[in-house]
Amino acid sequence: MFSNKKYIGLINKKEGLKKKIDDYSILIIGILIGTNILSLIINIIGEINKPICYQNNDKIFYCPKDWVGYNNVCYYFSNDNGNNYTTADNKCKQLNNSTLANNLTDLLNLTSFLNLTKLYHHHSHYWVNYSLNNNYSVPLIDSKYNLNRKKSHYTDLLFICSK
């Protein structure tokens, strides 16, 4: 009978140890799941609050949705039309205090990359000119203008903002 008590005691100790291992395993799994959920929430919030045009020495650069990033500058290509330079400049200022893209080297590289050129008319109605494959130009301007003494088709004034 004495040997039976030792046997029962050993069984109880093994069951107690197994129960502790099970309890700790559940606790560890719960902590891992909790930290994964927490990191997922932080990542989602981070995407919502992503900086608009953020640049620093770490070479991290973000542009807002519908903007194009090129050479650490954000560009916005309008889809709506404006009447003149002043209207376009005001629309750019409404977009995160951005300024109207001007004739800077970076903009020239970008417009060259996108097959765009800039056309000046010496008045307030000038804008970006898109060169087609056959070198026929479609000036994006709201006034009538003959390019190289040829009659051209015109579209509404489009604009580019940069930040």
UniProtKB/Swiss-Prot annotation:
Keywords carried by this UniProt record: Disulfide bond, Early protein, Glycoprotein, Host endoplasmic reticulum, Host membrane, Host-virus interaction, Lectin, Membrane, Modulation of host cell apoptosis by virus, Signal-anchor, Transmembrane, Transmembrane helix
Subcellular location(s) of the protein: Host endoplasmic reticulum membrane
Positions bearing carbohydrate: 84, 96-97, 103, 109, 115, 129, 135
One GO BP: symbiont-mediated perturbation of host apoptosis
Region feature Lectin-like, mapped onto this chain: 63-162
Gene3D superfamilies, per the entry: Mannose-Binding Protein A, subunit A
Induction annotation: Expressed in the early phase of the viral replicative cycle. Expressed in the late phase of the viral replicative cycle.
Gene Ontology, cellular component aspect: host cell endoplasmic reticulum membrane; membrane
Keyword Ligase belongs to the record: no
Function: Down-regulates MHC-I expression by impairing the appropriate configuration or presentation into the plasma membrane of the latter. Participates in viral hemadsorption, which may help viral spread. Reduces the transactivating activity of host TP53, thus inhibiting apoptosis. Non-essential for virus growth in swine macrophage cell cultures.
Description of how the protein assembles with itself and partners: Homodimer.
Name of the protein in question: Lectin-like protein EP153R
Organism: African swine fever virus (isolate Warthog/Namibia/Wart80/1980) (ASFV)
